[in-house]
Amino acid sequence: MDRKKWCSGLVWALEFTLVFCVVTTVRAKNNSEKSASAGAASPLAGLGSISGTVKAPKEFKAAKVYVKNVDKNVVYMVFTEGGRYQAVDLFPGNYEVSVTKNGFTDSDVQKITIASGGTATADFTLKEGTYRPNQQMRSGLPKGEPLVSYDELYPPGHARETIERTCIMCHGPDFLPNKQWDESQWNAGIDLMQNPNDNAGARLVPGTFAAGEREELVAYLVKNFGPDSKKRGLAVPDEPIDEKALGKAMFIEYHIPPLPKGDRGFHDAHLSQNGDIWYVDARGLQVGKMDPRTATWTDYPVAGPQYRGHGLTQDASGDIWMAGHTAFVRVDSKTGEIKYYPYDTEAKRPPHGNTPFVDSKQNIWESLSWANEIAKWDRTTGEVSLYKTPTDNSFAYGMVMDKNDKVWLADWWRCKVTKFDPVDSQWIEYAPLTRPCTMRRVFADHNGMIWYALEWPGKIGMLDPNTNKIVEYALPLKWSFPYDIQQDHDLNYWIADSGQGGALIKFDQKSKNFTYYPYVQRTDMPKIEVSSENSIWYTTRSADPKDQALGVLYPDKSKIQTLAGSY
């Protein structure tokens, strides 16, 4: 099956303090000769490499080595294997190199220069430091807040059960403990979640609370997270480490230049026909492209906040289509000219476009989250048609089209997989095996199986549309929070997870094995894209605005043939 058709759019508190010191030696060699100590020069013309050793007074696995090109603001990250590391395909220029590993002090930052085609060596010796438990990745969390066990953070009881099926499913475990609200504020928050007139609709529908449950909930929140409480977070398990797999891998993050005014804030990215990576800067009201071969950026501002974007796709002619807040947004990829096609000029609230896809006839389809609809822009007529989803307040989020042009939706709030047949306008809803739940995205694999990711309770599932059979797989760590799932060309499945502070996870369906690749920085990844060479592209949505980046994971850096990204 042609991937371009179906991918077109696509932190127990344990702390101990020890004496620390870092001794680092750096030896730089700027030449193009192959060296056993420095590693082979990059196979890509004009690019360089760096390698070295990391030592410590006690055993460790998979330390993170950061190699930052300060000229282009590009960060490479690799993991040690047996105390050695290598980063390849580095742009020529000035670099800062450092090492981090939880339980050890961070190394000094070492400055080196890599010439075109050159190699360098940097060796590090770490000393013991402080171990900090892991924490889920959520925007706005204070850095370094105390982390405690679940029962300490949320004392057991019926009110906790209510929180689990309402608040935590979407917000995660660290949202409530960081509020310190009084009774009136907690009641106002619940009122907002129940307000049917809010732009996004009611998150908590009538019937969510049985008699007395809301009052019980508010009393619990005031007692545990009231004005006199302290900000705290949940200590979650560390990711399992497969050092052999991590030793092969390399991340690259391309950091976007700041705007003259205002903050950056990525949402989705999309690979393109010519290898550029297109992106949505939702906070900065931009759509744009980045050439990973040169790390150059081009922004195209949209006409206003009413066109703020979410997802992207590309049609056969090369035009980029963005799901805007109130309209289809069409960008000429060559000239940057932008056109807008409103979803519904009479809509009482913004429809909030989410995920776009192109069908076999080059019609553009989108999920409209706040309107609980899907929209179609007809290639022949230019007209826009709207189709209402069968369940109110479903919040149609991720969307995919299969090889037969059937539309598949992930209903975030009502947690269903919903199918729409454009031929007869018929809908079919499929409930996951595990409920209650929340679901962000769906994916159609090469066999037509529909995969979904359940943020809560941390599972992935597969629906066979031919038999209606559903199989689910629990992620191995509690408090996993899978967002998206995609398939690579070796038939592995890749999961974007923010549960342990952020990781990409490879799932082998045959062996049922999960391999974790911890992120470069703390973030979530709302959408991942797999290239024709099995590189995994993402955005750093919930990272600090100053650290917004387009990122890519190469599971095997020895197989990199190009820095470009196409399907």
Name these PLM-found stretches.
Residues P260-N274, P305-S317, E346-K361, D392-N404, ...:
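Beta-rich, blade/repeat-based domains predominating
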Residues M525-Y567:
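Blade-level signature of beta-propeller repeat domains, shared across WD40, Kelch, NHL, RCC1
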Residues G93-G103:
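A short, solvent-exposed beta-strand micro-motif common in secreted/extracellular proteins
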Residues I163-D174, L217:
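The canonical Cys-X-X-Cys-His
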